[in-house]
Amino acid sequence: MGLFGKTQEKPPKELVNEWSLKIRKEMRVVDRQIRDIQREEEKVKRSVKDAAKKGQKDVCIVLAKEMIRSRKAVSKLYASKAHMNSVLMGMKNQLAVLRVAGSLQKSTEVMKAMQSLVKIPEIQATMRELSKEMMKAGIIEEMLEDTFESMDDQEEMEEEAEMEIDRILFEITAGALGKAPSKVTDALPEPEPPGAMAASEDEEEEEEALEAMQSRLATLRS
């Protein structure tokens, strides 16, 4: 570290351009991930409406928690995009410095952004590879592994669930519900066609459908 070009096989300008291309590619991956999670969330919303109409309080709560997890995952992905934009700006600055000084320089901004990006599971492998290349080039210093960030996630999740369930149910049902119901008698938005409620689904099938939905969301967030 510090000796620019010590083990470099490519010119600095070529390295910076390659890093920028990889970052943009990962941004597209993140965009797809966000869209997939949001599409699945729409399905969850419809399931919450159905469960509310049937007075299935436990199902409403489980699905609301899934939505909280999904929205939290989407927020983290948007944050990762912001960090990637910071790295891209840093790469532009490196090219400007390279033209003047003839070598790459250390960047605290890039360092901070990369420290955050290597913790994002969806892009972790690529970001670790990039960080190693940037360390060799002297742009960033060696980063320590930080594995403690998500230790309190479960506890925070429970607290958030208690606070957010009512709000989410109110939001999904356009105000027809303010909290998880014990029995719903009020008309909800987008009512079922006549006769649809008469044929209630088998309980086991509903459980399987719920588990399948949870599994899909967990896969998208992983």
Swiss-Prot record:
Domain notes: The acidic C-terminus and the basic N-termminus are thought to render the protein in a closed, soluble and inactive conformation through an autoinhibitory intramolecular interaction. The open and active conformation, which enables membrane binding and oligomerization, is achieved by interaction with other cellular binding partners, probably including other ESCRT components.
Residue(s) at site: Important for autoinhibitory function: V48
Annotated segments matching region Important for autoinhibitory function: 59-64, 168-169
Cross-link position per record: Glycyl lysine isopeptide (Lys-Gly) (interchain with G-Cter in ubiquitin): K179
Family: Belongs to the SNF7 family.
Spans annotated as Interaction with VPS4A: 151-222
Name the UniProt record assigns to this protein: Charged multivesicular body protein 3
Annotated GO CC locations: amphisome membrane; autophagosome membrane; cytoplasmic vesicle; cytosol; early endosome; ESCRT III complex; extracellular exosome; kinetochore
Compartment(s) of residence: Cytoplasm, Cytosol; Membrane; Endosome; Late endosome membrane
